[in-house]
């Protein structure tokens, strides 16, 4: 069986309440041997770390504040995130960045919150788990101010254009891909992105419970979960005309090296 790492799961989402053990066991049964829980607020990051503590070597976590939650950011948030990031099972700073699509937090507040997390990444020497939506220009202007000091970065759930992908690759960033790559109605443009991006600069993720792959059998429950990660690898293999095992091996190695995860 191929083995995988899911670099982004929202296991604290209420859709997964009281099902953590079942979700994790189904993932393991499908070759998803390690998973990284996404922290999107101070509270959510703490919850993710607590869950990860119960599954050493299998679950890890990020710690950060999503741009939607930037409005809750204050000085206390910085010290709380710093303390979380000192823990070994917390492997990345984020999910952080800018989201100008819905503007759930005021843009100046998003920018300040993002800058603080860029600085935290430099301080604790842990990579960045980045979010950018409808904010490409401003996101890059801010990121470029820190570019030569930040350790490493992955743009999570990438759905941008080929030109945007090239710009991120030129910065040395990695790209995270979800089930969106199998959605030919909304994201057909990602086919050329997948063909272009080198396999050793890709990581795969479910972003569960969101981004359900379109290339899997139709189910009553339309909720995504980490057990479905192989369908993302399957789409990449199809578009690149390579084996699924090659996709699994390369993306797993990339994720382990990037996040410093041992198996």
Enumerate the language-model features and the residues they cover.
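Mid-domain alpha/beta scaffold segments of enzyme catalytic cores
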Residues: 1-263
């Amino acid at each position: 069986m191929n083995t995988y790492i899911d670099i982004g799961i929202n296991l604290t989402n209420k859709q997964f309440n009281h099902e953590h053990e079942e979700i994790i066991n189904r993932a393991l049964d499908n070759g998803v041997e390690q998973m990284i829980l996404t922290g999107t607020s101070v509270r959510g990051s703490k919850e993710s770390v607590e869950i990860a503590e119960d599954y050493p070597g299998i679950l890890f976590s990020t710690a950060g504040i999503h741009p939607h939650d930037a409005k809750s950011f204050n000085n206390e948030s910085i010290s709380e995130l710093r303390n979380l990031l000192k823990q070994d099972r917390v492997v990345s700073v984020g999910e952080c960045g800018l989201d100008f699509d819905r503007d759930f937090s005021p843009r100046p507040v998003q920018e300040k919150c993002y800058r603080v997390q860029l600085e935290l990444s430099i301080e604790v020497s842990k990579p960045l788990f980045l979010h950018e939506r409808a904010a490409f220009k401003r996101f890059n202007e801010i990121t470029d101010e820190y570019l030569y000091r930040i350790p490493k970065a992955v743009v999570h759930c990438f759905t941008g254009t080929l030109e945007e992908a090239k710009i991120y690759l030129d910065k040395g960033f990695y790209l995270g891909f979800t089930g969106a790559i199998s959605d030919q109605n909304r994201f057909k443009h990602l086919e050329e992105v997948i063909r272009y991006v080198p396999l050793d600069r890709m990581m795969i993720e479910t972003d569960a419970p969101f981004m359900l792959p379109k290339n899997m059998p139709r189910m009553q429950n339309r909720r995504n979960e980490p057990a479905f990660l192989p369908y993302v690898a399957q789409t990449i293999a199809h578009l690149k005309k390579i084996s699924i095992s090659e996709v699994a091996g390369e993306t797993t190695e990339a994720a382990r090296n990037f996040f410093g995860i041992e198996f």
